């Protein structure tokens, strides 16, 4: 009889070393960004103070931390922006319009046809993508 070890071997090249638990965004204020992302993702705000907010999703969390001298990322410049979200949606234009109503800004330069680039209220870029592209 062979015993199977349920704990992944961290030395294996096929085993994950970690799992994504949360992504944290920097902002000058937590509440507006927490409310924005709560509406966009449909995730509840589990914690909200002036210094920090956390939204909880089905398997991940989104944190928002106060950085007093936070500067908005510049897109599409390669400067401060380090990553962006790609969100799959069924109706690009309708969801983009709703995001704008919630405080997002549609960027002027739109590099693709199956996605729309916006910035959240703190300036973080994110893309709405056609859900059909994700299978």
Predicted regions and their residues:
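Vicinal oxygen chelate
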Residues: 2-20, 35, 41-86, 97-121, ...
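Generic alpha-helix initiation/capping and coil-helix boundary signal
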Residues: 20-21, 92
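Short hydrophobic/aromatic beta-strand micro-patches
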Residues: 24-26, 86-88
């Amino acid at each position: 009889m062979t015993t199977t070890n349920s704990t992944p071997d961290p030395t294996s090249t096929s085993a994950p070393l970690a799992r994504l638990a949360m992504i944290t965004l920097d902002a000058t204020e937590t509440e507006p960004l927490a409310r924005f992302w709560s509406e966009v993702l449909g995730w509840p705000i589990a914690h909200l103070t002036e210094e920090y907010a956390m939204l909880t999703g089905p398997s991940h969390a989104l944190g928002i931390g106060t950085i007093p001298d936070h500067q908005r990322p510049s897109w599409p410049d390669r400067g401060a922006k380090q990553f962006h979200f790609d969100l799959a949606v069924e109706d690009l234009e309708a969801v983009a319009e709703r995001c704008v109503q919630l405080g997002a800004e549609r960027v002027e330069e739109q590099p693709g046809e199956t996605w729309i680039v916006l910035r959240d209220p703190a300036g973080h870029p994110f893309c709405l993508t056609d859900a059909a592209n994700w299978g």
